[in-house]
């Protein structure tokens, strides 16, 4: 949201979640169609591995684009286009797949925290920690970007380097969580606004740790509610996230008026 200067921006804008979804779709839906399901490598890779490979490909693309494209709007458009292309390929695979394969992919796409094993957690935690450390190292750059890229540049900030680090951090965090837990929406969009409301501060030295804490508590509450009523966690995050988004839109409209 700070980089794009857009209160309705979220981590999925970069197409990372779409990359993970495409990787999983190719594993569940595409491998049987193409006759690849018998390969031992694909069988051992699993849903998480295929999702992470899809994420890694998009991560590489984001890093290259952010270094080459000067205008931040260009990066945003490229991310959205990646999402549309991935979505189109997934729809084609869904159309050609069997009911059993569709069910498996649909269950993954609903998102869940309950299917992560201890072994997977051992892989997930180090990658997430790396992403968090990169984001913490970008705190000064993010504070400068609050006043716009031109101001940050006059203060001696390397825009390309900082932007690349921020995107890599976002891609690592979003892509890893999506690969392991499925695409859980609205948390990345709503939680930063809830954090700003609670702490009443725009300083990223407070916002980033605050967002970690608020996101942790919010996601845990959503998961508890989802388990109690036997619902997909995505439904609960959407029900709680939509009012926050509507509040942000209403607040911005009042500012404009």
Residue ranges with predicted function:
Residues 1-257:
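Alpha-helical transmembrane segments in inner-membrane proteins
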């Amino acid at each position: 949201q700070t980089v794009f200067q857009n209160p309705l921006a979220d981590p999925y804008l970069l197409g990372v979640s779409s990359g993970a979804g495409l990787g999983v779709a190719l594993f569940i839906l595409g491998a049987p169609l193409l006759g690849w399901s018998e390969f031992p490598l694909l069988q051992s890779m699993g849903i998480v591995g295929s999702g992470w490979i899809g994420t890694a490909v998009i991560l590489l693309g984001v890093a290259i684009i952010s270094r080459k494209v000067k205008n931040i709007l260009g990066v945003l458009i490229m991310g959205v286009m990646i999402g549309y292309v991935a979505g189109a390929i997934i729809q084609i695979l869904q159309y050609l797949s069997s009911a059993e394969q569709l069910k498996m992919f649909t269950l993954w796409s609903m998102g869940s925290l309950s299917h992560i094993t201890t072994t997977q957690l051992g892989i997930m935690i180090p990658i997430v920690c790396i992403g968090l450390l990169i984001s913490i190292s970008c705190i000064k750059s993010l504070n400068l970007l609050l006043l716009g890229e031109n101001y940050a540049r006059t203060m001696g900030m390397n825009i390309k380097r900082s932007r690349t680090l921020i995107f890599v951090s976002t891609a690592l965090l979003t892509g890893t969580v999506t690969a392991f837990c499925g695409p859980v929406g609205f948390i990345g969009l709503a939680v930063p606004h809830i954090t700003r409301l609670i702490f009443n501060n725009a300083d990223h030295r407070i916002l980033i740790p605050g967002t970690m804490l608020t996101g942790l508590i919010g996601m845990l509450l959503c998961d508890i509610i989802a388990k109690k009523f036997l619902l997909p966690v995505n439904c609960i995050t959407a029900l709680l996230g939509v009012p926050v988004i509507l509040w942000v839109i209403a607040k911005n409209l009042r500012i404009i008026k």
